[in-house]
Amino acid sequence: MPEIAMQPFNLPAAWRSTDYPTKDTFAIDLEPRHLEALNADVKRFKAAGGGHEDINNETFPLCRIAEDIARWRKEVHTGRGMILLRGIPVEDISLDDLRLLYLGLGSHFGRPVSQSNMGDLVGEVVNIGDKDPKERAYRSSRELMLHTDRADHIAMLCIRPAIKGGLSGYASALTIHNIMLEERPDLLSHLYNGFHHHRFGEQPPGEPVVTRERIPIFSVTDGVPSVIFIRGYINLAVDEGHVTLSDGELEALNYMESVSNRDNVRLDFLMEPGELIFVNNCLILHTRTEFEDSDEPTKRRHLIRLWLREDERPAADGVLIHKGKAGIEKQDGKGTYYTSKTAA
């Protein structure tokens, strides 16, 4: 049984929603000099030639705003666990250039990795599957549970919001842990022991549909805490009959989910055009409410996403296996749609 943290986490990322009455309390308005530096590096990178896979913090150095980026990165990695940057002129920049700018800035927070079988370093968060549960969540309009992704940090840049709904939600995993430590410490052992995850058709060739290893929800390595919470993939492994849950495991999952949705824990707000949020995915859960989309393709909800790896971050073996060194392996001919093997 892994060692369980039996003292509350007293870290900046152990915040509650009541600490941030509005997103204005943690937003940063970009200045002209920030945009000038970003645009200059986009032009320089395009002139040199190269693709998305060639972008990193050396090919996109952003030297003129390096001190600001270092401060923002510190806030994400070891501070609050998230920052909101405002003022990217998404209507005045081509989508191709916007992707370059986004990857270039994001590479200073971590190494961009693939987000699906398609090998996409920039994920298009668009409504392809409506409310179909067979489609990956980020390509649907259905309400999501608070969860983490398979990366150390994530970023979301809003190009267009939905016509109704689609609020972004966040909750500190450290706060959830602290509350459970106070109220139901007996349940934590199940969360530290972890669960087998369904791979949703994204396992490499020759690998099983469900992870061989238990993936810990909470873990601490060299004093550094991590969370992995994807209830949907745990549920799918159960629904297809690959694993069963004990009464204690089910209670622990339900209690964690209930705590995460408390009003004084969960923070919800609307992402508006030109707003970019960086989130420490090792410490912060995120979600999105159900939304209604426009019938006009050019007016539909559109965000773009990054998955970023922080290679130096200590993590348990199960965490490293879950995330992979390069994200989700690209597999030609495969997309983001999965048909469950659950019996009819």
Feature-to-residue mapping (PLM):
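A short alpha->loop->secondary-structure connector
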Residues: 102-113
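"Short basic amphipathic alpha-helical interaction patches in structured regions
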Residues: 96-103, 170-172
